Amino acid sequence: MPPKQQLSKAAKAAAALAGGKKSKKKWSKKSMKDRAQHAVILDQEKYDRILKEVPTYRYVSVSVLVDRLKIGGSLARIALRHLEKEGIIKPISKHSKQAIYTRATASE
């Protein structure tokens, strides 16, 4: 085999820029999910909406109120306790982590 031919500095630099290597992998290309902007203070409009809509729901829980009414979780828990005290909804299952309610029927 003949000896390897020595390249000049300019030739070496041109070879380095020629881009023979693959670019580094980017770990995250996903778009970030927008942060929810739910209400944390109950105004009269939200209160009226809760009193009007929630009695029509068949299944009522904190997550249902957060999803449908765009209110915070602590506000939803307070609203559920208030509606239960008023007799508008009745509990199905209650424990420290999750409370599930249904609408109260007139016969009960």
UniProtKB/Swiss-Prot annotation:
It holds the Pfam family Ribosomal_S25. One of its GO terms (biological process) is cytoplasmic translation. GO terms for molecular function: structural constituent of ribosome. Its main location: cytoplasm. It comes from the Eukaryota. Coiled coil: none annotated. Residues 1-30 are annotated as: Disordered. Residues 1-20 have a biased composition (Low complexity). One of its GO terms (cellular component) is cytosol. Residues 21-30 have a biased composition (Basic residues). It is found in: Cytoplasm. The keyword Ribonucleoprotein applies. The modification N,N-dimethylproline is found at residue 2. InterPro entries: Ribosomal_eS25 (IPR004977), WH_DNA-bd_sf (IPR036390). It is presumed that the precursor part of S25 is engaged in assembling of the small subunit, thus being essential in ribosome maturation. Component of the small ribosomal subunit (SSU). Mature yeast ribosomes consist of a small (40S) and a large (60S) subunit. The 40S small subunit contains 1 molecule of ribosomal RNA (18S rRNA) and 33 different proteins (encoded by 57 genes). The large 60S subunit contains 3 rRNA molecules (25S, 5.8S and 5S rRNA) and 46 different proteins (encoded by 81 genes). Belongs to the eukaryotic ribosomal protein eS25 family. This is Small ribosomal subunit protein eS25A. It comes from Saccharomyces cerevisiae (strain ATCC 204508 / S288c) (Baker's yeast). The lineage of its organism: Eukaryota, Fungi, Dikarya, Ascomycota, Saccharomycotina.
